[in-house]
Amino acid sequence: MYSKEMLQGILLSLGRHNLVIYVNENAKLGYSVKFYLDIRGEEEFLESIQRTLLQYSVLSSIVSSGNRPTLRITGIKNLVIISALLPDLPSYRNDVQEFKDIVAIFVVKRHKTLEGLEELMKIKGVL
């Protein structure tokens, strides 16, 4: 188990958010959006992070893809909790504010509108 400060450090240094925008003909706009946070590492390390996240009611899963397992945090409720845990400090990739902006868009469900989708594309660097 890790302390809150250690968990924040792990999230700042190893956490990498992924925003996937893909064509979905069944969606209202013709596109769907997936957003999740990944942490890569050794399985024992990821399991200890997973146990620590459970203290904050954050559900996650360990996905075995590639050469190292990945701890994946999905679901807007879980990502909102993670966003609240993250301090307003610069991260290694300077993407904390970007993560918080994306979470804010999902919270108010703007990702389901054309304007929100355009905002997400700008954040992602597509537009």
Describe each model-derived feature in a short phrase:
Residues 1-127:
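Internal intein/HINT superfamily modules and their associated LAGLIDADG
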